[in-house]
From Swiss-Prot:
Family label: Belongs to the RNA methyltransferase RlmH family.
First-tier enzyme category under EC: transferase
Enzyme Commission no: 2.1.1.177
Keyword Transferase: yes
Any one Gene Ontology cellular component term annotated for this protein: cytoplasm
Primary role: Specifically methylates the pseudouridine at position 1915 (m3Psi1915) in 23S rRNA.
This protein's name: Ribosomal RNA large subunit methyltransferase H
Amino acid sequence: MKIRILTIGQKMPAWVLTGFEDYFKRIQPFVQTQVIELPMAKRGKNDSDADILKYCQIEGESILAALKPNEVLIALEVGGRELSTEKLADTMKSWMLEGHDIALAIGGPDGLSDQVRKAAAWHWSLSKLTMPHPMVRILLIEQLYRAMSINHNHPYHRA
């Protein structure tokens, strides 16, 4: 199994890079993980709903274009399915046994397009809270690492 994180936005603040890189390095011995940063559509100050929809569509097209044919697409969004860490570990174990490569899609500030939602095999919510997309990167990689540490009997997870 390989995991690719397809994420909108290329210029992250230093605190995001620091937090993300720590867990990104930790997860590599457990599962090959890659991050694909895709450009965020340029936004204006007084964008209409139609403009925002257009931005989401542009970003969605770049996510779908980056998707490999053998990957299972998982959309990260508020309305997705919530999982406990233990359930995530079980789910990841199933993916590994089935040989699935996974692509996790993180939208931009306005979320994911309808095209990405429809293409996704699964919809996952890290929380009912709305979060800035840079924060999602850190929470996602930490939860992936935590799940893999459970599956490998590593002492990181102590719940």
